[in-house]
Amino acid sequence: VEFIMKKSFFIVGLLSLLTFFSCQNEENVYYSCDEAEDAWVKENLSSIRKMETTEWFSISEKLKLPVYRAFSLEQKQSVWMEKLEDVMMNNEWKTEEIEHLQQLYDALSMHSEWLIPNTEKAEEDFDAFKIFTYKWLAFAQKELGWSNDLLSAIVGTANRIKIMNGIALIEFSNGLNGVKNRSEFTCNCNSSNVIWTTCSTSNCITRSCSTTNGGCGFLGSDGCDGLCSK
């Protein structure tokens, strides 16, 4: 009996410890550097994780990224797949450009794990992701002549884009189009990114901000801890 009681106390204690650490981990996840936005997301997690992709595209612009960070892996994949479909269908591309975009689309359809933040990826997944992105970006820049601004509009934001006169305009949820001024947003880049910076042609400057759970870099795979310099 004494052995059974000790075993029961051990199991209860272990479960309590695991619960404590899981709560600690949840509390240490930041969906936004803005405390009010972060609190709102945490209060609405259950409804956010039922949100459809079309609804995400239409929510307030300032909440898009915090909500995206709270999405399940399947939701994130759906957002990027729809964004890439829209990029291919609603803009004019040369055949080789469409093929290159399709390559990214196909890869993402098979590798939803690539949308896990880089710091949380399994080593073999991170290695495969790095190899693919390096090759994909190199071909886009050297063979297709795509600018950093165009690449940032395609893989640096999940928002839809419209290309006019060679300039990629990002479509905002308020119906306006424009070149995104990243310095207007809180914590919009990763200062130690190893694959791709969302700053396009500028540098990411570290600032006092809690690192968020993804949302920056190539397909939002980096956390955000800084601001793009002008």
Give residue ranges: language-model regions.
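Positively charged n-region of N-terminal signal peptides that target proteins for export
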Residues: E2-S8, N25
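C-terminal motif of bacterial Sec signal peptides marking the signal peptidase cleavage site
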Residues: T19-S22
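N-terminal propeptides/leader regions of secreted preproproteins
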Residues: Q24-E184
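Sec-dependent signal peptide hydrophobic core
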Residues: S8-S16
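Generic signature of intrinsically disordered, low-complexity, basic-rich segments
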Residues: L15, S32-E35, C216
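Secreted, short cysteine-rich peptides and small extracellular cysteine-rich domains stabilized by multiple disulfide
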Residues: E184-K230
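Intrinsically disordered, low-complexity, compositionally biased regions/tails
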Residues: L17, D149, I170, F218, ...
